[in-house]
Amino acid sequence: MAAGVAAWLPFARAAAIGWMPVANCPMPLAPADKSKRQDELIVLNVSGRRFQTWRTTLERYPDTLLGSTEKEFFFNEDTKEYFFDRDPEVFRCVLNFYRTGKLHYPRYECISAYDDELAFYGILPEIIGDCCYEEYKDRKRENAERLMDDNDSENNQESMPSLSFRQTMWRAFENPHTSTLALVFYYVTGFFIAVSVITNVVETVPCGTVPGSKELPCGERYSVAFFCLDTACVMIFTVEYLLRLFAAPSRYRFIRSVMSIIDVVAIMPYYIGLVMTNNEDVSGAFVTLRVFRVFRIFKFSRHSQGLRILGYTLKSCASELGFLLFSLTMAIIIFATVMFYAEKGSSASKFTSIPASFWYTIVTMTTLGYGDMVPKTIAGKIFGSICSLSGVLVIALPVPVIVSNFSRIYHQNQRADKRRAQKKARLARIRVAKTGSSNAYLHSKRNGLLNEALELTGTPEEEHMGKTASLIESQHHHLLHCLEKTTGLSYLVDDPLLSVRTSTIKNHEFIDEQMFEQNCMESSMQNYPSTRSPSLSSHAGLTTTCCSRRSKKTTHLPNSNLPATRLRSMQELSTIHIQGSEQPSLTTSRSSLNLKADDGLRPNCKTSQITTAIISIPAPPALTPEGETRPPPASPGPNTNIPSIASNVVKVSVL
């Protein structure tokens, strides 16, 4: 009964406030959907991050990857998951698109990576929501401009070797930092532009009076000096214009360009003044032409990145500037008409016509207020106040857009310059790395270590020999010298670098193993005390200058009784067969292995080169419990195993 009351209580409350009537009988249970199964809750594993959603959620957009059957290719049978090796952060936005139907762009994501993820899942970026679409388009445009700049710089660098003379000259004009000569010409033209502008200003300054005449300007008092300065500047500008015209890729487009027109207007008054006579009728026209010399200041735009950015900003804000001009024109006409009719009844009014009222309207809307024209009537003052407030609103609205565009273009140029500098430094490092291969680097490093060791142990003559001799050959001959000192045998060189043939010596096996060159230096500076341990460093006839640290390694000494295949596998670079007089066999007594260091050969590093190597000796036969050695192996015969023969192989590795 209590359960029934609890079930009806929400409906009773709803009926009390008028939501729904109270039913006469209990509500039936909700029908179970047989088609809805638990396995419709699928798991999407994106780079280790698991996302769960309903299959019907993904099937809302069957044209995409997750909504089609193509996602079955990514199904993992072991984990029963769909695994995608993609960015999990972007996938969160993708999954929200399937859930809500709205695609958003996260501002912290890279635009290229975001586009790649959308392309992988088969989602068009045009369906991005209105709240994020403008941000997406701005980032897309900036990325496209950056890639275009990078491609242009790469194309310019790739086409540099095949540039013609004209192309090289034009590239020097457009980018003066390509060569020293172009940079010098760039600064020379900039200096003469500054001199020309200063001359045009200073020649109008009064420079005293002449007796019997009025005060003269400097241009007339020192006419020769100013003429020489003007001539020098015009000559430089003329040469620059002709060179640019010659090197231009398209001369027609160059002549039509704004900077070309400025160059012509800047130098034309000088040549017109040369051919113009002193006739008073044309002197006024000549003075008017001299005014155009002030346009030479626009030539600074080639030398100032800020001026160029300002030009690009005004060009990119053409629509905003057009809106500003159109709004001002409408407001000027409206308020000029209103002010004319408002001040028409005043006797001392200066608003004589609507065009005359334009001046007052322009000055008022731009918040200048010269005060030469002021309204007299109350209606004129009221409309004048409205005109002033309207001007503030009309002018202030497009200004933030222009400022933001200027900031965007400026920072874009800064980033482009920084990328070019970084790329130039990276290419320089790559060129330096390509000049020397890894073998050359290792060769020089090894020579440095060996020369350092020779400076401590060798004589000047030997150091000179070590520097002039070949590294590998010197190491090889040093190794032969060490073997001769150790075994008392002579060697016949079969190959000057790799292989040597001599007679056999039993129970010796030299194994190749790479060691550092400083091992020899350490061994030459150290005296080994006598010891009772069977160390190789104290054994007479077995110690060499290139194997003094063999006892410090943990590598097990191979046994001469191992199979021949094991012995052959230990050979790496070369095999030395030793031939000579009959040598006494090694004693099998453990006490005979412990000799004093003075009895053996002392380490000898007084050679032209030092070679580091590892010589491993087979372990002597084990002793019997009675202290006697086991009998030696039988002499070779028809039934002798291969290991007894293979034990006479000496293997040497030359570093």
Curated annotation (Swiss-Prot):
Intramembrane residue spans: 353-366, 367-374
Transmembrane segments: 183-204, 224-246, 254-277, 284-306, 319-343, 378-400
Membrane topology of the entry: Multi-pass membrane protein
InterPro entries: BTB/POZ_dom, Ion_trans_dom, K_chnl_volt-dep_Kv, K_chnl_volt-dep_Kv4, K_chnl_volt-dep_Kv4.3, K_chnl_volt-dep_Kv4_C, Shal-type_N, SKP1/BTB/POZ_sf
One Gene Ontology MF term: metal ion binding
Stretch list, region Interaction with KCNIP1 and KCNIP2: 6-21, 470-487
Tissues with expression: Detected in carotid body chemoreceptor cells and in frontal cortex.
Domains: entry comment: Two N-terminal domains regulate binding to and modulation by KCNIP1.
Annotated function: Pore-forming (alpha) subunit of voltage-gated A-type potassium channels that mediates transmembrane potassium transport in excitable membranes, in brain and heart. In cardiomyocytes, may generate the transient outward potassium current I(To). In neurons, may conduct the transient subthreshold somatodendritic A-type potassium current (ISA). Kinetics properties are characterized by fast activation at subthreshold membrane potentials, rapid inactivation, and quick recovery from inactivation. Channel properties are modulated by interactions with regulatory subunits.
Name used for this protein in its record: A-type voltage-gated potassium channel KCND3
Species in which this protein is naturally found: Oryctolagus cuniculus (Rabbit)
Gene: KCND3
